[in-house]
Amino acid sequence: MALNFPNIDPVIVKFGPFDIFGQTFEPALRWYGFTYLVGFVAAMWLLNRQADRSNGLWSREQVSDLLFYGFLGVILGGRIGYVLFYHFDYFLASPMYLFKISEGGMSFHGGLMGVITAMIYIAWKQKRTFFAVADMVAPVVPIGLGAGRIGNFINGELWGRVTDVPWAMVFPSGGPEPRHPSQLYQFALEGVALFLLLYWFSKRTKKVGAVSGMFLLGYGIFRVIVETVRQPDAQLGLYWGFMTMGQILSVPMILFGLYLILRPEGKQ
């Protein structure tokens, strides 16, 4: 027998309404945004802790700089990636779709590209190597990923494929069929398991770029696994009859992650 979705109100609290220049606004604090905020604060705390233990290699001010540009990279890259990877036809028909943030839509792979761009800038600004920055950031990224998947679950979105497993769940927007709660699988793998893996691995290697490589490898493998039970995007379906867009975008991550881990010591 399928479990019922808990139907948590996605809005925690509403403010207003407010009248500003004849326009009515009713801002709200939503669980989706709140989970990301919690993830951001937790990541900031851990990065500051790492900075305090870095023997002067990092300061808290430099961490704040990194977080600011990293956050911009996630938001801008995530939105642009979502539109280009998953709704390119909408964008061609109406370029303003890119700015319709209120309709939702973020892509991890786009966000990753945005963060990489931010890290390149920080490396240049702080006169570091790129992987010195990336290895600092990689272990805390799963915190934000896990928090975001909890937000997806509360929103009742990005559910899995139809199944008859005992823990299958009926989602309000997923029809009457029981489905995999794939958001929770992603929370467990991309959030908890990946965080523990990176924490363990970062204590056992000093090789520049290896921690970044393990993040790419671990995330890529976990994403490929979960995509086998996650409902493919309706507008894209399956490529070649068996691969989702998420899996296609994860394959280069896996290959490059392996390269970073296995490349000879000292090779930049």
Swiss-Prot record:
PROSITE patterns: LGT. Catalyzes the transfer of the diacylglyceryl group from phosphatidylglycerol to the sulfhydryl group of the N-terminal cysteine of a prolipoprotein, the first step in the formation of mature lipoproteins. It is a multi-pass membrane protein. The chain crosses the membrane at residues 27-47, 66-86, 104-124, 130-150, 181-201, 208-228, 242-262. A 1,2-diacyl-sn-glycero-3-phospho-(1'-sn-glycerol) binds at residue 149. Its EC number is 2.5.1.145. It is found in: Cell inner membrane. It comes from the Bacteria. HAMAP family: Lgt (MF_01147). It is an enzyme of class 2 (transferase). This is Phosphatidylglycerol--prolipoprotein diacylglyceryl transferase. Its main location: membrane. One of its GO terms (molecular function) is phosphatidylglycerol-prolipoprotein diacylglyceryl transferase activity. It comes from Shewanella sp. (strain ANA-3). Belongs to the Lgt family.
